[in-house]
Amino acid sequence: MKKQLYRIVTGILAVAWMCLIFSFSNQPATESSKVSGGLCHRLVERANDTLHLDMTEKQQLAMAEKIEYPVRKAAHMTEYAILGLLSFAFYRGLLKKEKRQFLAALLTAAVYAATDEFHQYFIPGRSAEVMDVCIDTLGASIGLAILFFTLKVVRKHCQKSKLTLQ
């Protein structure tokens, strides 16, 4: 019963995260740009105030524009890192071998990234880019790699302490 509840909860979390990604992708380009542009401008404003950079409003806008692309891509990578982790949690309750859990999670994120890009093709002002699928999949890979090495370190520590972690 516990395993079944775990599968249901982790499955719901992964699907809910996919829905969130879908909702972001469903925004027309103008709306999406307005959101990310506003965020970048607030980040630059905050940095200017905190670090006492004395940038003019024009310089702040130019800097916000300059960082918008990397900020957007970092956000995509983060979205897909989280999707990779949630998918791993789901497959953890479904598959026995850990290697298969990692591979299934990565494959799920990669396939979802591809379908998400296909979906964006039909949104006004948006396009489908193979490079974005690669960036999203890289995000999932990084999230899963961090998890893999964290588990490795924790297990090593637990062995030294004679604890078990499964």
Region annotations inferred by a language model:
Residues 113-137:
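Interfacial helix-loop-helix junctions of multi-pass membrane proteins
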Residues 4-8, 96-104, 126-130:
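Membrane-helix interface segments
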Residues 16-21, 102-121:
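Small-polar-interrupted transmembrane alpha-helices in polytopic inner-membrane proteins
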Residues 80-93, 138-154:
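Membrane-interfacial alpha-helical segments at the cytosolic side of multi-pass membrane proteins
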Residues 69-85, 130-138:
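Membrane-interface loop-to-helix entry segments
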Residues 158-166:
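Membrane-interfacial, low-structure loops and terminal tails that flank and connect transmembrane helices
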Residues 87-109:
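Post-HEXXH active-site segment of zinc metalloproteases
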Residues 2-79:
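"…centered on the first transmembrane helix and the immediately adjacent amphipathic helix/loop
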